[in-house]
Amino acid sequence: MSGEEDQGLTEALELWGGLECTVNRVLDEYFSQMDRNGHIHRLCDIERFASLGIRSIRYPVLWEHLAPNGLDEIDWSWPDDRLRALRERGITPIVGLVHHGSGPQYTSLIDPRFADKLAAFAGAVAQRYPWAEYYTPVNEPLTTARFSGLYGLWYPHGRDERTFVQTLLNQCRAVVLSMRAIRQVNPDAKLVQTDDLGKAYSTPQLSGLAEFYNARRWLAWDLLYGKVGQEHPLWDYLISTGIEPSQFLWFKDNVCHPEIIGINYYITSERWLDQRVERYPGHHITNYRGYRFVDMEPVRVLATPTAGVEHLLAEAWERYRLPLAITEAHIGASREDQMRWLLEMWQAARNARQRGVDIRAVTVWALLGSYDWDCLVTACKGYYEPGPFDVRSALPRPTAVAGLMRELAAGRQPSHPVLEGQGWWRRPDRFTCTPVATPTAITSLHSEYKTSVNGTMRPILVTGATGTLGRAFAIICGQRNLAGILLSRQEMDIAVRASVECAVARYRPWAIINASGYVNVDNAESDIDRCFRENAVGPSVLAAVCRERDIQLLTFSSDLVFDGRRASPYLESDRVGPLNHYGRSKVEAERRVLDHHPDALIVRTSAFFGPWDIYNFVTLALKTLAQEERFSASTDITVSPTYVPDLVNACLDLLIDKEAGIWHLTNGEPVTWVELAFKAAKKAGIDTSRLDGRRGGEFGYVAVRPLYSALSSERGILLPSLDDALDRYIRSRRQEAPAEAEERKSGRRGSGMAA
């Protein structure tokens, strides 16, 4: 962080980091992000953060964690170790004291003594760390007040204007008193005040409501700046709550404007308001201030994109003339779109600086990812969004976002090929309803943002054009704007080097995904040469060519590389011992590929099912049982099923991350085939009385199968649970029923990987 405020725009734009550290309360339960992401137990994370090249970090020294029973019982060892480690690595901490919280159980956001109690804690922190210069005593006071006092999501679960305004006043007063207590120890301490900043757009009929929202968004900063009095546009609204005017006017006598205004900007920060509710999905309909209307993200409905964060930065600068920083830059999306979003935020900040806006930094938010923000942290569901590090491994694993951060911090040109494509928020398929044309949202797309939808991106070549897996990659690459090119054997025979070299020269891919192969396990016992050609020779040729041309390679292996003598899921490091020729071909492929290309990615998976073919086990079981016919499945062969969309998405993330070596990817739960059929039928509401369990030996298999081939991973559990996957599969099958009927009618049939 730049040390002198008058340096302004002479300093380069800085890259900061932020740790998702929310401790919010729902009823009497506290949800702690640091407990979920494991940082509470890992001092070694500091070294990981330092490796990103960040200059400053928004770092938690949280009231709820340190003083749950009062200031007399604080154990300072946790922040002592971590703040010391940050200083040793030259990273400036921006110390956060409350992050979407309501304090320990002995207070709350409606406690008249909340501000005094937080100020006492802030003073204790300053006494302990008198060198600390930058503070955010309360993160996002306006947003927290809305969620806790108006929407009823978090404690104290208010749903009225008075509770909303009172919780906002208490938090802002706490900021003032906390900074006063801190400055008694360190007079040079500086306030970095964060909040979400968006903008509301509307139809003409709702322009008054949009105007109200657009005035309300500034309210926390206005209070701290001493701008709220009878001249304020929301004065009548504020005093209509019944709160004494003196509580608002107190801030005029106790001005505590930030040294840096922190702008948190998300794809959901801006809103579109429309009274024509029949045009939109029902879950977006709401009622407020006498209106019934739709409230949703403009990006999903407006034909012309809004001006976005660059324009909002300029608005904040014109309003306050104080230095700014983007203090949260994150999007919950696939890996490439996370990178595209971060780069767009960085470019927007640079553009704003060129227009004279004093913006100091862009903060990459959620260095360790975040949990359950899809439900606004109202329940502990386990939904995880990774960030620069993915904590679903034994130790946090750097993703491609970390690589982009290092390039930005070092001033290098971002180099990842996926950055050549547009994010979903700029693509034609972003709409969830009929697009609305409006003059109120005027785009200011910078030329740097106008990256390609498909034309100029370097592609990913995908083999296996006739197979289920290859087609799935083609579908999902299209959904993620990754320019996948699906090739048949005629277009590229992977076992013929000249054919591979010709395709590589023609398409210039940055990655190749080998989704082809010999899949009939029983036929492989007599068709050995062909099996080994497709499953071992072909991947080894791809590996050699990819290594020579610096192309990333993803290829697939199988659970059938194991002998089944274990009674617990196999890990990547377990000894292989195939029982059949198919398994032997996969073992040989693994050996050859890694010999030729040590940076190749090999994914072992098993028993997959999905919505885009009608011949996988789960689909056949449900179809047969639904037709009131008998269906048999083995009771003594245990596998770990894999949902194809989950598999493909995780594989693409790992490929973008440049992961290498062998990974196991399944939806986790070991089940027998009959248990899988039973579980799926129950979820689909299909009668299971005609489901028969039989021993594997009764099915007349030619090739020997391992009795236990379930997979787990020591490298990372990346896929959702089997129950979650089956739920989504069944919903998808119902939605895809017309397409499935057309596929049956036309007689198309794809091969799948061996179960």
Predicted regions and their residues:
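Active-site region of glycoside hydrolase catalytic domains
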Residues: 2-16, 80-340, 347-449
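Catalytic domains of carbohydrate-active enzymes, especially glycoside hydrolases
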Residues: 40-62, 256, 260
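Catalytic helix-loop patch of NAD(P)-dependent Rossmann-fold dehydrogenases
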Residues: 158-166, 533, 537-541, 561-603, ...
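NAD(P)-dependent short-chain dehydrogenase/reductase
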Residues: 202, 591-639, 646
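Mid/C-terminal beta-alpha module of Rossmann-like enzyme folds, strongest
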Residues: 458, 648-651, 657-707, 730, ...
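N-terminal Rossmann NAD(P)H-binding glycine-rich loop of SDR-like oxidoreductase domains
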Residues: 458-479
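NAD(P)-cofactor binding segment of oxidoreductase domains
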Residues: 526-554
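NAD(P)H-binding glycine-rich loop region in Rossmannoid oxidoreductase-like domains
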Residues: 497-534
